[in-house]
Every structure is written in C-alpha cells, then in structure tokens.
Amino acid sequence: VGLLLKEGARASNITKIITELNDRLLRKILEIAERKFGKPPVAYCWVAFGSEGRKEQTFKTDQDNALIFADPETAEQEDAAGRYFAEFTAFVRESLLRCGFPPCPADYMASNARWRQPLRVWKKYLASWVSTPMPEALMHAVTFFDFRPVYGEAALAEELRTSLIGLLRDQKVFLGHMANLVVKNTPPIGFFKSFVVEKDGAHKDELNLKVKGIAPLVDIIRLFALERGVRETSTLERITALRGAHTIVQEYADEFENAFEFIMLLRIHHQYEQISDGRTPDNFINPNELSNLEKRSIKDAFQLITKAQDLIIERYKSMIW
C-alpha cells in the first residue's frame, strides 16, 4: 500500500486491492471450514456488507457478514442446516479474529443466528424493514443493503437483491425515511467555511473523516441507487450506473467521484502514517495539519455534500422532519 501511495494510486484502486486480499483470506477460511465440517446440508452464500460489501475497506475494519442458505425442503433438513451453520460460522468468526479482524460491535455477523437464515426468511426481513421503516429497521437497512456475495452460491444473494429492488419500487414512504436519515448527518463545515471540529476529549480539534466525510457521501449515493434499482454496491460503481439514470447524479457525477476519491485517499494516507509509526489507525485528522490545497479540496467536498443534502430535502420535502 505504501508503494501504491508513493506512485499516486487512486483511493479506489487501493481499497479494491485491500478488499481482494481480505476476500481471498475469507474464502480460504471458508474452504477450511467446509473441509472441517463436511459438505453443508444445503447450498449457501456468504455475504459481506458495510465497507466490505462496498469494496471500500481501509486498514481499520471489523467483521460485517451474514449467511444466506437455500430454503430447506424438509424440517429435518432445516434442523440439520441450523446445526451445521451454527458450528460453521462460529469457526469462521474465530478464524477471522485470529487473523486480525475483530468482531462487529453490533454483532452483525453470520455467527449470530439472526443473520444466518434461509432465503425465504431474508426476504421476510427485507419486506418487514421496507414496509415498516422504524428506527431499528432503518439501521438494519443501512447496514445490510450494501450486501455483496463473497463465497458460495452467489445466485442466492442475487435473488435477494432482485427481491429488494422489487420491494423498493414506488416505495416513497421508506425512501423518505431513508432520505431523512441521509440529510441529518451534515458535514463539519460552518457558515464561514470554517471546519467544525471536536471541542474536547481525545480528538479535540480533529474531525472524523469516516463519519463526517465518507459516510454522508456513501449514504447519499446509496439512497439514489435504491431509488433507481441499481444492483451495484460500491459507491463509485453506483455513481457510474446512475450517470444516465438519475438527474442529480447526472449533474454532479464527476464532483461526487472526485470528493469520494479525495476523502478516501486522505483517510488511507492518514492511517498508513499511523501504522508506519506503530500507532493504531483511526479516522480523525486535524485540519490545521492539511496543506492549503487539501483544505480547499476537503471544503469543496463538504460543500458538495451540503448541496446534495439540500436537493434531497427539496425532493422529499413533505417527508423531512
């Protein structure tokens, strides 16, 4: 990664390489698990979500995964699948932990019985979240809707994606609730284009690039992708797919791409320097340590986020509170 940074590689190329390496490691662990526990009773697909699902991983990442398995034909087969995948996913979780991937703090992992289910149950989950967009359902939606098949029967994940696209067709109420979430996370820039930083604590005078920079862009583009039934999960691939299909993206596609690439690259540089110094990587930077060009570029990115959020408020004005 250090060599790629020196050569001026784009952030998206670096995150793709990191994701590919992580995917290969995960697939190897899953192959070992299959040898250890034998052939599964039914076909399954291991899916990643969050930054892993979007292929946007940096150095600091935890386990965000789930398991979809084919609908069992009998009660006996369902029991066998339940027992098999309980042991299987526990082994994978511990193996990933030993390889340096900590468990998800919110327990969004296949080792949690709630997140390893047959396809029919997953379809019910999605239908429930979309039809009743309460806060918990929206939290699950934001987490899971970036799911990507990593190993196994990818057709199971593709069928679930098709089901989700169908559920969201003309679902203005759910999309309105999602829009409401999207516009609440405003970028850290004040009225006079000054940075809004942490006022106290361990990160005093710093700002969180992930929460206040990357996340708003990811959320904005995800909303637009859900509006148009886009199958892609990565932010940049979604922007490409939306260029000819969404009026806001048509107008600001290049700006969205540049803003995302810039903030992500700033984050990767920051984390690489921390690791090189023997420190734990985080997402906090002190804007006073940025060059004038970097300050200008990040302010432009934050202003773009504000502009997009204003357009979303206009689009969903009766549903924003």
Question: What is the role of each PLM region?
Answer:
Residues 1-321:
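A nucleotide- and high-energy phosphate-metabolite-utilizing enzyme signature
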